[in-house]
UniProtKB/Swiss-Prot annotation:
Residues 21-69 form a propeptide. Keywords: Aspartyl protease, Disulfide bond, Glycoprotein, Hydrolase, Protease, Secreted, Signal, Zymogen. This is Aspergillopepsin-1. GO terms for biological process: proteolysis. InterPro entries: Aspartic_peptidase_A1 (IPR001461), Aspartic_peptidase_AS (IPR001969), Aspergillopepsin-like_cat_dom (IPR034163), PEPTIDASE_A1 (IPR033121), Peptidase_aspartic_dom_sf (IPR021109). Belongs to the peptidase A1 family. Monomer.
Length: 386
């Protein structure tokens, strides 16, 4: 009985301490919608979009694509051809329109360290009163079209939806190339790949998602990109109203820092990366050739740097099988854009991966799917959009 009394007393004491402690904040789930607003026309360079995706993954940009960048452009708006999807994010108190990118792990932004001539039309990060510069830390990025950016690193408050990372690494641009300054819709990038590939030197930093996932109901986010319309990101929960049927899950190999998984197209097995920061589907040459063999007058057009076809063509759908689930991309999504403004020749949304050891399933693929990025496993879940 003495032992029982001691245990009871201890239990009572623990319960009293617990009741005196503040309750842990409830875990959250929230949805952040992408922008829907009028955006003026701007010039996009289709071969440059292709080249940037290749160089992002360490691939070589062939000479014919480099040559095509010199004359390949189309005057359009981002919504019309789904070049990029932008999402509002509060960075150090400034609301900025960022590109959410599951193919990289950096959060970089236009900053007040840039000359005013390079920030026209952009929201600019200014460190908050709580923001601190990380002495000796820096970052640098470059892409296949010659664009580049780099600068200093700060710790500051970053808020997406209702969730805040109070000491998030923010990569503030102090120098930036003209290609970025011309895109006045985009104030930077928020990476959602794995923190292991963050490029900050001398020590990589944690992504926003890794910083806040303990605050979420579940350590996941789900992506609903739309064809020629704004989509949404669900953080911490799965919205069953956004897909039909059941989710099919597949294991992720994150050894290279990406959301990589196994898939099949036709009779060909391949590894693929789900990348919201890449516009196109970039796949094995044989798969691209098999697909375009079904499209009259389609060919690998060296002048324009990739597969083209008559804009009047009716394109077949494209199917990627993932752990038994057939993810179907409608042909209209693959008819990406005219090679120049008003042209009757269109640039394909499926292109050759130029020998990369994996394929990239970018927005052309993702905007027909509801995709769950689950850090437990890790794993990916796929279902058709509702």
């Amino acid at each position: 009985m003495v032992v029982f009394s001691k245990v009871a007393a201890a239990a009572f004491g623990l319960s009293a301490v617990a009741s005196a402690m503040p309750a842990a904040p409830p875990r959250q789930g929230f949805t952040i919608n992408q922008l829907t607003r009028a955006i003026p026309k701007r010039t996009i360079n289709l071969p440059a979009i292709y080249a940037n995706a290749l160089s992002k993954y360490g691939g070589n940009v062939p000479p014919h694509i480099q040559d095509a960048m010199a004359h390949g452009s189309a005057v359009t708006t981002p919504e019309q051809y789904d070049v990029e999807y932008l999402t509002p994010v509060a960075v150090g108190g400034t609301t900025m329109n960022l590109d959410f990118d599951t193919g990289s792990a950096d959060l970089w932004v236009f900053s007040n360290e840039l000359p005013s001539s390079q920030t026209t039309g952009h929201s600019v990060y200014k460190p908050s009163d709580n923001g601190t510069r990380m002495s000796g830390y820096s970052w640098e990025i470059s892409y296949g079209d010659g664009s580049s950016a780099g600068g200093d690193v700060y710790r500051d408050t970053v808020t997406v939806g209702g969730v805040t990372a109070p000491g998030q690494a923010v990569e503030a641009a102090s120098h930036i190339s003209e290609q970025f300054t011309r895109d006045q819709n985009n104030d930077g990038l928020l990476g959602l790949a794995f923190s292991s590939i963050n490029t900050v030197q001398p020590k990589s930093q944690t992504t926003f998602f890794d910083s806040v996932k303990s605050q979420l109901e579940s350590p996941l986010f789900a992506v609903t990109l739309k064809h020629q319309a704004p989509g949404s990101y669900d953080f911490g929960y799965i919205d069953q109203s956004k897909y039909t049927g059941e989710l099919t899950y597949t294991d992720v190999d994150n050894s290279q820092g990406f959301w990589m998984f196994s898939a099949t197209a036709g009779e060909t097995d391949f590894d693929a990366i789900a990348d919201t920061g890449t516009t196109l589907i970039m796949i094995d040459q044989s798969i691209a050739e098999d697909y375009y063999s079904q499209v009259p007058l389609a060919f690998n057009n060296f002048f324009y740097g990739g597969w083209t076809f008559p804009c009047s063509a009716e394109l077949p759908s494209f199917t990627v099988t993932i752990n038994g689930y057939d993810a179907v991309v409608p042909g209209e999504h693959i008819k990406y854009a005219p090679v120049t403004d008003g042209s009757s020749t269109c640039f394909g949304g499926i292109q050759d991966n130029q020998g990369l050891p994996f394929s990239i399933l970018g927005d052309v693929f993702l905007k027909s799917q509801y995709v769950v990025f689950d850090s437990e496993g890790p794993q990916l879940g796929f279902a058709p959009q509702a």
